[in-house]
Amino acid sequence: MGATAVSVGALGGGKAIGQAKKPIPKDPLKIAAVSFLTGAAAAPFGIPGDNTFKMCADVINKEGGILGRKIELMSKDEAGGVDAQVKLARKLILEDKVDADLGYISSASCLAVLPLSDETGGLIVAYDCGTHELMEGTKSPYEVPKFKLGFRSSAHLGIDNIGLALFIKKYYPKIKTIAGVNPDYAWGRDSWLIFEVAMKKLMPQVQVVKTLWPPLGNTDYTAHISALMGAEPDIVHSSLWGGDAVTFTKQALGMGFFKKIKMAYSRGEPYPQEVGKDYPEEQIICCAGTHYFLFNPPDKTSSGLQKWFVAEYHKRYGKYPTYPCYHAYQAIYAYKNAVEKAAKTAGGWPTIDEIAKAMTRLTFPSPSGPITIREDHNAIEDVLVGFSKLTPKYPFPILDPKRMEVFPAPRVNAPVGTRTVDWINSWK
């Protein structure tokens, strides 16, 4: 891994060795890791994310910790709704005195919890939630950052839905109709909004023939599947996730849906592994970045991390890492790299404000490639899109290696201070 601890004496910043301005505490670092550990989102999202937090903390501790301080990881369940998460975040920061709160898969959780960073004075890093509204202002241009102590260490849903639109334009330039089935809350509404705006800009001839909004946690999609089949769109966009995506896929298989209609899944990368060999081929799948266990990053450092990460995760948990795993890695290593960067200037253990300053404009290596957190406190990433394809080597479809597209970060991330929708509408 190469995560090297930095000694106190090496942090003097011009001072004599051993004369650190700020002593490094000897007690462990208390880091909260909040993911869905129960419920429909646990198996495909929360548990893989939590497993990765545990794996990374274990590796960091074996390598000496962060500036010599071992991590005491506090895994917490995101289940229970928004009010429960607000209460939990307050407790973690104000009572448990965590050094950092890393977490949150649900966009609703993030929208409620991240404002608590500045209110409580605690560092909160959102690791997986996708709504673009989390860090954007109400109109362009807007001031950044929205939160002084709040960050997101992964890109927002803009990359997924813009990436899908770019992919569809390349591979299906003659389609005429699309439809959507998305969960009826911020994540689903925002995902469809960005996809629809991008499609109108890139392929203005395409018409929307059906939009459906099942509730989060729905267990019966037969009516939705029938309605989509009746509308006969060329492609159906979906941001269904977790157990909802698995349930929809299995019910759609039983109704012959995929024999007639192609799906374009925003952040659909985990589901072939979850469903198994029955997962349909030729479906369009986005990876929430370049978070895919067979992706080989072009730079040597990231490529080495990817090989280690995939092998280590598979050895520990018997599965291949999916994108929530990569997002968890990014959160804990964003914190580690920010602390080490801040310590060089602080001359010892940095304050929360100093860590936040160091995390702003931070670039650090990851298994998917270098990650940059911009001055708006949001990470930007490239995005990978491909087609599902069965092969003899794996018991589930992989992405067809001959038809994968990586769209670079500048093509799928709006500039700092510009709302994503406004940016798309400005395309020439």
Language-model-detected regions and their locations in the chain:
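Signal peptide-proximal N-terminal region
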Residues: 24, 50-73, 200-206
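Short, charged, surface-exposed loops that flank catalytic or proteolytic processing sites
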Residues: 67, 340-357
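Beta-alpha junction/loop-to-helix N-cap segments that form part of ligand/metal-binding clefts
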Residues: 20-22, 44-49, 64-139, 153, ...
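Extracytoplasmic "Venus flytrap"
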Residues: 23-25, 32-54, 76-83, 105-106, ...
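Extracytoplasmic ligand/sensor domains, especially the bilobed periplasmic-binding protein
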Residues: 51, 98-211, 262-288
